[in-house]
Structure formats: C-alpha cells, structure tokens
Amino acid sequence: MAQPLCPPLSESWMLSAAWGPTRRPPPSDKDCGRSLVSSPDSWGSTPADSPVASPARPGTLRDPRAPSVGRRGARSSRLGSGQRQSASEREKLRMRTLARALHELRRFLPPSVAPAGQSLTKIETLRLAIRYIGHLSAVLGLSEESLQRRCRQRGDAGSPRGCPLCPDDCPAQMQTRTQAEGQGQGRGLGLVSAVRAGASWGSPPACPGARAAPEPRDPPALFAEAACPEGQAMEPSPPSPLLPGDVLALLETWMPLSPLEWLPEEPK
C-alpha cells in the first residue's frame, strides 16, 4: 500500500486555541506536492494582517472641515474679485487723467505742428511738444549753449548782477554771489570791530540834551535834567586812532529815544 505524501494532520493542532480560522497553518516539514498555504478563499476568511477597505455606507457623515474649506475659498474668491475691480478702477482713472493732460498739451501746439483734424497718439503728442519747445528756445536764445555763452560774457565783463535768464546754478551768477557775500562779510566784521574798539576806548555816552531838543515840555526837561547834571559839561571825545572822526561822531550822536518821548503829544 502506497504511503501518503503528506502526513495526516493531528486533531490537536486543528483544534488548538492559538490558531483560529483567521490564522494560516505553518508549513509542514516535508516537501509536499502542493503548498499547504492556499488562497484565502479556501480557508473561508482573509488574513488579519491584510487591510481590507470597508465599503462606504450610505448614511456616513462627511469631514466637518470640508464645509469650512469651501466657505474660505468662496470668501477669498470674493476678496480677490474686489481687489481686481479696485485695481481696474485705478487704472481707468489714471488713463483718463493722462488723456486729459495730453489734450491740454495739444491745445498749445500751433496748427503748423499739429493739424486740427489729425489724430495723434500719446507718444507723438509728446514728441511734437518737445520739438516745439526746442524750437522756441532756439528762437528766443534760451538754449543751453546760448545761456552759457551769455553767462561767460557777463562774467568777463564783470557785471555785478547775474544773468536774469540763467538758472540759479549759473557759474557766473554763483561767482558773483560768492564775491558779494565775501564783501558783505568783510564789511560786517569791520563794523563790529569798530564798535568793539570804540567801546573799549571808553567814549562817554552822549547826552540827549546835546542834540537839537524838540519843543520844551515838562517830562522831557525833567528827563534831560536827570540824565545830565548841571555841573557836568559835555566835552567832545578825543579822536580814536582806530576809528575815523565821522564814525565816532555817528556813534556819539546816535541814541534811541527815551520812553517819555514815545508818548503822543497832548492836544492844546
């Protein structure tokens, strides 16, 4: 009698608690003609390790985050459309302003440059305006070369004033202004030094009574008597070696009016 190729399985192994219907049996020690591991259908169940996709049920709930994502997308689309609309409005306003400015510029172009019935683009209008302005500058002698030539001529002639047609940064005008500022500073320093020298030499202050007094009135007379005592005699100050006589006379006779002389004259 022929022996079976595979030994019979023991009943204890088949009824073992460690191996259920979802477990696969271990392979036998001997090589059988066919594999003991057959398809899952032969065992009547699927392996526990293999994931099985459960079919979708008709009553299942959706993810709660899905509606919020939809609302956010709708809101962002509305914001984007509003921003695009505002940008379009700004661009339209800018183009209208530019067209209005070019229309005003074309009004100043003569018919010989821009005929009345001829339509011009923005670039053509700007080019014609530039050419017309250059032509007027050349006719009036206001070109850059003419202005520089005039500045050089006036600078060589030693004119004290700058060229009235030149801008503020004209070389001749800047040189003239620098010389005038230097002379003014020198005069100011000389006057300040003269005043300081006169004060250091101690020339006595002038008395208001020495000047030609106005009509005799009581308050000025009292002020003059208080300022110049009877025993004090006004003597001319000695000439200073640092100041000429006319400067000293001017400094001695100059004095601000007294507060009493500021009062208005009473009607008689």
From Swiss-Prot:
Pfam families in the record: HLH (PF00010)
Miscellaneous comment as given in the Swiss-Prot or TrEMBL entry: The N- and C-terminal domains are separated by a 2-repeat G-Q region.
Chain's role: Transcription factor. Plays a role in the epithelialization of somitic mesoderm and in the development of cardiac mesoderm. Defines the rostrocaudal patterning of the somites by participating in distinct Notch pathways.
Cellular compartments annotated: Nucleus
GO CC annotation terms, alphabetical: chromatin; nucleus
Name of the protein: Mesoderm posterior protein 1
GO biological process: cardiac atrium formation; cardiac cell fate determination; cardiac muscle cell differentiation; cardiac vascular smooth muscle cell differentiation; cardiac ventricle formation; cardioblast anterior-lateral migration; cardioblast migration to the midline involved in heart field formation; embryonic heart tube morphogenesis
Gene3D superfamilies the UniProt entry points to: Helix-loop-helix DNA-binding domain
Domain bHLH per the UniProt entry, residue ranges: 82-136
UniProt region (2 X 2 AA tandem repeats of G-Q), positions on chain: 182-185
An example Gene Ontology molecular-function term: DNA-binding transcription activator activity, RNA polymerase II-specific
Provenance organism: Homo sapiens
Comp. bias (Low complexity): 66-86
Gene this protein is translated from: MESP1
Ranges of biased composition (kind: Polar residues): 36-48
Keyword annotations from UniProtKB, A to Z: Developmental protein, DNA-binding, Notch signaling pathway, Nucleus, Repeat, Transcription, Transcription regulation
Region (Disordered): 17-93
SMART domains for this protein: HLH
